[in-house]
Amino acid sequence: KGSMGYRNIVIRDESGANIVQAASQWSYIDTETLRPVRIEPEVGTAYPLAEKLPMEYAPRKIRLIEEMKEIDRRIVLPYQIDSNNHMNNEAYIALALEYISSDDMICQIRSEYKRQFVKGECIVIKKAESNDLIQFVFADEEGQTRCIVEFKTKRTGRQTA
């Protein structure tokens, strides 16, 4: 659809039961101008259309918990860079997981990417918790949010801070 792509992903166990379901929305961006562009027909044919999976679809934007606290600063390292020369989407999740207690059983992961980090940039990491949610904001040194990661958890013995 125009410059937007939608993808469902299912991972099944050996018996065929769904163990992970995911939905994602993507913007097709011109890497030179960093502007959305219409999806080219040959790209569209590489991803055939299918029916949406029956599942809960979260809103596109993550509503932030109000009291975010800075917990760390990190530099983007070469191994976190993908083929587009920016921080790989998975690296944001892996980084957030470093600040999650092993007592938290993660039930859902959401992420909202606003602008990519590149090698050598400083990531200001902020964290907030409320009930069963743990959120991270990855911002630049000017305070601009680049990515939000949210975990929905089941508490397994730890107290909320």
Kindly label every feature range from the protein language model.
Residues 1-60, 114-119, 128-161:
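HotDog/MaoC-like acyl-thioester-processing domains
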Residues 88-106:
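Active-site helix/loop of acyl-thioester processing domains in fatty-acid/polyketide metabolism
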Residues 6, 71, 108:
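Short coil/loop residues immediately preceding or within conserved phosphate-binding loops
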Residues 66-78:
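Short amphipathic
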Residues 102-127:
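A conserved acidic, glycine/proline-rich C-terminal tail/linker
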Residues 18-21, 68, 105:
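A short, structural micro-pattern
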